[in-house]
Structures are given as structure tokens and as C-alpha cells.
């Protein structure tokens, strides 16, 4: 899962959206640095990552990547799940339009920015203003996201080519998304994530 899915599941679970978004920017034990609700959100994010990576649908999807891109498949798939969520948002969350949800999420996250790591602050400088969560529905933007990640971290250069794996298996990936994501939504609503 990437930014949108973590925020969505946090909302369904009535967990800290701030903590769920912040989690990838925090190493080790967050309890000394953040308030309890944010810490709980960070832990929820970490549980979701472990759960998602071990889902049979996700393990199967990783096998569809070519040898030269399989190492970055987990990252690429996280971004792709956000694509499907953004694309099908009106079906999955009909009572909370994506644009409104994005504004709501931004308001929640802004409350912790003064005490956040600089990399997280940098992310927030463009995540909201460039409308990433809405633009995830566009595959050209997904390609741009993967290229941007590869540019910032040269050891992840294979992300550029992983776009071709997504394109080659688009329909099958979408099917897998529909197989697992509604289950995760239900688990989040029951606070079981």
C-alpha cells in the first residue's frame, strides 16, 4: 500500500491519518517522539505493510515481474494499488468523494508537520499541492512517480522499467486488487488491522 491506501484504511479504522502517512519516515520505536495516537497510526501502517506483502494475491503478482524488476516489485505494487484505489474511489467510498477526502487527510496531517522529519515535510510540500492522491488514477502519473523514485534513489533504478510489468499485467493486477482490498477495508472498519 502507498499513501492513499494507508490514509483510507486509517480513516476506516478511525486511526491517526498522520501516523499512518508518517510511518515510512520513522525508524525504530516512535513512542518517545510522537503522541500516542500518532504512534498507534505508525504501528497500524507497519502491520498493514506486513499483511499486504504476505497476501497470496500480492505474492502472486510479484511473480509476474521480470527478473530485472522483481526486486522492486513490492514498491511498484504499492504504488499500483493506490492507482486502482484512486481509479475506483467512487465505488469503494461513495459517501466521501476523493477530492473531499484529500482535503480532510491534508488537514489531519498538517497538525504534526512542525514535529516531523524533514523528508516528511518535503513530501507534504508537493503531495497535496500537486494532488497526488487524485492523480494516482492516471497511469502516466504512476509512471512519473516510479521514475521520480528511481531518480531520487539510484539503487532503485529498476523502478523505471517496472512500469512495463504493470502495463503487461494491468487487468490481472486489477483483478487481484478487487480480491483483497475490499477485505482490508472490512478489516479496517472492524479495527482488525
Swiss-Prot record:
Q: Which UniProt keywords apply?
A: Fatty acid biosynthesis, Fatty acid metabolism, Hydrolase, Lipid biosynthesis, Lipid metabolism
Q: What is its EC number?
A: 3.1.4.14
Q: Does the keyword Amino-acid biosynthesis apply?
A: no
Q: What class of enzyme is it?
A: hydrolase
The Gene Ontology biological process terms listed for this entry are: fatty acid biosynthetic process
Give the superkingdom in one word: Bacteria
**Which Pfam families does the entry link to?**
ACP_PD
Keyword Lipoprotein carried by entry: no
Instruction: Give this protein's Gene Ontology molecular function annotations.
Output: [acyl-carrier-protein] phosphodiesterase activity
Catalysed reaction equations from the record:
holo-[ACP] + H2O = apo-[ACP] + (R)-4'-phosphopantetheine + H(+)
Q: Its family?
A: Belongs to the AcpH family.
Its annotated function is as follows: Converts holo-ACP to apo-ACP by hydrolytic cleavage of the phosphopantetheine prosthetic group from ACP.
Protein name (Swiss-Prot/TrEMBL):
Acyl carrier protein phosphodiesterase
Source organism of this protein record: Escherichia coli O6:H1 (strain CFT073 / ATCC 700928 / UPEC)
Amino acid at each position: 500500500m502507498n499513501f492513499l491506501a494507508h490514509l483510507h484504511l486509517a480513516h476506516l479504522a478511525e486511526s491517526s491519518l498522520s501516523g499512518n502517512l508518517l510511518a515510512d519516515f520513522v525508524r525504530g520505536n516512535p513512542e518517545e517522539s510522537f503522541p500516542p495516537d500518532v504512534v498507534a497510526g505508525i504501528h497500524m501502517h507497519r502491520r498493514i505493510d506486513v499483511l499486504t506483502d504476505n497476501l497470496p494475491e500480492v505474492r502472486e503478482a510479484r511473480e509476474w515481474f521480470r527478473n530485472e524488476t522483481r526486486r522492486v516489485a513490492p514498491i511498484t505494487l504499492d504504488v499500483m494499488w493506490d492507482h486502482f484505489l484512486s481509479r475506483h474511489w467512487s465505488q469503494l467510498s461513495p459517501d466521501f468523494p476523493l477530492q473531499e477526502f484529500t482535503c480532510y487527510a491534508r488537514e489531519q496531517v498538517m497538525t504534526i508537520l512542525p514535529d516531523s522529519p524533514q523528508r516528511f515535510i518535503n513530501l507534504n510540500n508537493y503531495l497535496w499541492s500537486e494532488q497526488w492522491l487524485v492523480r494516482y488514477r492516471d497511469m502516466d502519473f504512476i509512471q512519473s512517480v516510479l521514475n521520480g523514485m528511481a531518480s531520487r534513489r539510484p539503487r532503485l533504478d529498476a523502478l523505471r522499467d517496472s512500469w512495463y510489468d504493470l502495463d503487461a499485467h494491468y487487468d490481472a493486477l486489477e483483478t487481484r486488487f478487487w480480491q483483497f482490498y475490499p477485505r482490508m477495508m472490512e478489516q479496517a472498519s472492524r479495527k482488525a488491522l
